[in-house]
């Protein structure tokens, strides 16, 4: 490890620190919580003489906010907002390994590669004499991205607000200005239980669900394909779970499905529910009961790529245009709070949550250089 660059060493140390989201099922209780990462970042800020504070989010879980003041009066603000939590893994996943130019370990890709590149650039700029004259740079380590995004939602509610936020996620160093929203809906049908030998005396709730499933998997996607966003394409629908009945010889009196509806800008949770109900009505299908399975909104992200500060980041990252992605990130809650947000970072989303998660050290280095160039050129 002594031969590693300061950036690679920072990533190694971050991956070594377990930070499994405690809201997710995990049998290794000692490996849960973001507090150790927050303390680690706090220590780095303290030794560099940089101002920091905590932001309470959930019991025992806090965002860490580290602020780099400009040389003059604050006129603008930029936030770097990677999340500190990771998904569950076995203890050996927190023993980093480097092979063929890649660092392996839980969170290497999602998203400690982003923490390392963002925070290293932040600390490097703090040592520079010529820091931005009027732009405050704020590094925020967020909790709970992997579950309910409580960290970014609290940041959006309490502030600070900024001219731009960059949420750290594995984007292969592409600049993301749009992503789909996410709506989970439970649909339920009712029936009447009866003995399996005399089904005529019951009403089969699974049979009642059958035309609903057929509509959601065949007719509804055709309707959605007619609607497109320039960066995101069409919205999607997926039936993720189904539950019904207790045993083969009993006519089921209830059936439930959970659907995952990915939304594009212009759609709302209510408009989606109304659209599905109208489709059932049009096809003369008895509508099931609708209930949301999430208590917080997850709308799509749609940041204007023509914003001057977005164009500045594109130039710093050597990209000509922004892209869209189908998955949900902290950028959406942050943008809901009034701060335009992008998504950016080293690594491939295909590696996120995988058993042998890894990130290219070369990509981490390139991300750090892009962030540093961007921050250095701020006014």
Language model features: what each stretch is:
Residues 2-108, 127-133, 348:
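Acidic/His- and Gly-rich active-site-bordering loop/insert found
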Residues 111-112, 116-184, 379:
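Acidic/histidine-rich catalytic neighborhood of metal-dependent amide-processing enzymes
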Residues 99, 121-138, 216-226, 362:
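Phosphate-handling active-site elements
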Residues 1-2, 36, 56, 177, ...:
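Metal-dependent amide/peptide-bond hydrolase catalytic core
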Residues 53, 78-80, 140, 164-166, ...:
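Hydrophobic/aromatic beta-strand patches that form the interior of the parallel beta-sheet core
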Residues 102-117, 195, 344:
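Glycine/serine-rich anion-binding loops at beta->alpha junctions
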């Amino acid at each position: 490890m002594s031969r590693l660059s300061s950036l690679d060493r920072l990533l190694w140390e971050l991956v070594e620190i377990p930070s499994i989201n405690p809201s997710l099922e995990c049998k290794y209780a000692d490996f849960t919580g973001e507090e150790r990462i927050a303390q680690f970042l706090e220590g780095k800020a303290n030794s560099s003489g940089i101002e920091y504070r905590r932001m309470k989010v959930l019991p025992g879980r806090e965002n860490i906010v580290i602020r780099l003041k400009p040389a003059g009066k604050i006129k603008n603000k930029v936030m770097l907002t990677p999340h500190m939590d990771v998904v569950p893994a076995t203890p050996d996943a927190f023993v980093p390994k480097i092979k063929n130019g890649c660092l392996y370990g839980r969170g290497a890709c999602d998203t400690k590669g982003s923490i390392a590149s963002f925070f290293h650039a932040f600390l490097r700029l703090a040592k520079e004499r010529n820091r931005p004259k009027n732009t405050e740079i704020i590094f925020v380590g967020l909790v709970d991205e992997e579950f309910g995004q409580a960290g970014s939602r609290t940041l959006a509610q309490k502030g600070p607000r900024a001219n731009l936020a960059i949420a750290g996620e594995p984007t292969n160093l592409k600049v993301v200005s749009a992503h789909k929203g996410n709506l989970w809906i439970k649909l339920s049908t009712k029936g009447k239980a009866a003995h399996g030998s005399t089904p005529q005396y019951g009403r089969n709730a699974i049979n009642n669900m059958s035309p609903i499933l057929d509509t959601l998997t065949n007719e509804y996607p055709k309707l959605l394909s007619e609607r497109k966003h320039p960066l995101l394409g069409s919205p999607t629908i997926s039936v993720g779970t189904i539950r019904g009945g207790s045993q083969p010889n009993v006519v089921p009196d209830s059936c439930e499905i959970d659907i995952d509806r990915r939304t594009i800008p212009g759609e709302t949770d209510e408009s989606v529910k109304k659209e599905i109900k109208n489709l059932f009505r049009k096809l003369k299908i008895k509508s099931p009961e609708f209930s949301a399975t999430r208590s917080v909104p997850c709308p799509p992200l749609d940041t204007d790529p023509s914003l001057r500060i977005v164009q500045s980041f594109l130039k710093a990252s050597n990209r000509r245009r922004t892209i869209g992605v189908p998955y949900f990130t902290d950028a959406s809650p942050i943008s809901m709070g009034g701060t335009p947000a992008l998504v950016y970072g080293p690594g491939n989303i295909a590696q996120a949550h995988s058993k042998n998660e890894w990130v290219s050290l070369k990509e981490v280095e390139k991300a750090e250089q892009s962030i540093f160039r961007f921050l250095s050129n701020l006014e």
